[in-house]
Amino acid sequence: MTSVTLEAAPDAWAEQDAWADRKQFINPAGLEIAYVEISGAEPALVLVHGFTDTSRSFSLLAPHLAGRRLIMLDLRGHGASSPGKGFGIADFADDIAALIRHLQLDQPVVVGHSLGAMVAIALAARYKELIGGLVVMAGTLKPDFASDHPLVAGVQALRDPISPTDPFYDWWHACRPGVPQAFLAGLANDASAMPAARWRAILEEICRADLTSAAQGVRTPTLIIAGGCDPLFGEAHQQALWRCLAGARLLRAEACGHNPHWENPAFVARAIIEAFEA
């Protein structure tokens, strides 16, 4: 695919069919990492998606951040990025550090959703000098999923080839009315391209993660965005984040579930802009 940085065009960037064609690639240490870039004002925003998603996860948010430089990557093993040899939180964080250095980003604000929020915390702890701000959206320090949790049970039941119409997606991508069906279909197609064994391998790493110590060492200005109806990481998880991330501000998207940037992207964009452009 041609490597090209495009100017922001809100309506076009929210369109789904051509999303994969917008990806560029870097190859740090032999691992190919895909990303989508929209040019704009600095500091850049580095947007890190959740488990089984891709850079597409931020396609509804991007138009509301028009005028700002956006870097939206596919985590290793997701989308068009190579799987590499490990799926630990630190592995993902190291990849993002390599991307920041490759693009010579100056103190970007890193916005992480769900798994991406966990990765962003690890990044801020491991590479303090690289980032200028942190947004932890629908995140957690320690998922602590029981063996009968719907996510664990649902992933264990998946078999290749995974269908984009598998009933599991009705739960996994559940959100309030109004989220475009073309967007949700694109997410399901992206996720279904991942082998079931990779779903399970990544989820195992998520389940064993504990970012408490890492979060306690973060000194980056931090905004926590919590979905008021989040079925995965509810109020107890958000309070734990707030206690451990020194000086963090906790903001609730009251009517949203686990995906505030899909359900109310204007709210999320406004929160990010107000937090880091004040």
Region spans (language model):
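Conserved alpha/beta-hydrolase catalytic His-Asp/Glu region
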Residues: F145-P150, P161-G217
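Conserved HGGG/HGGXW glycine-rich cap/lid loop of the alpha/beta-hydrolase fold
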Residues: L31-S82
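Catalytic histidine-centered segment of alpha/beta-hydrolase-like enzymes
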Residues: C256-A269
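Conserved acidic catalytic loop of the alpha/beta-hydrolase fold
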Residues: D91-P108
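Alpha/beta-hydrolase fold catalytic core
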Residues: M1-L45, A66-R68, L105-D106, A193, ...
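Short beta-strand/loop motif that positions the catalytic acidic residue
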Residues: V218, I224-A226
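Flexible "cap/lid" loop of the alpha/beta hydrolase fold
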Residues: I121-R126, I131-P161
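Acidic catalytic loop of the alpha/beta-hydrolase fold
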Residues: C229-F233
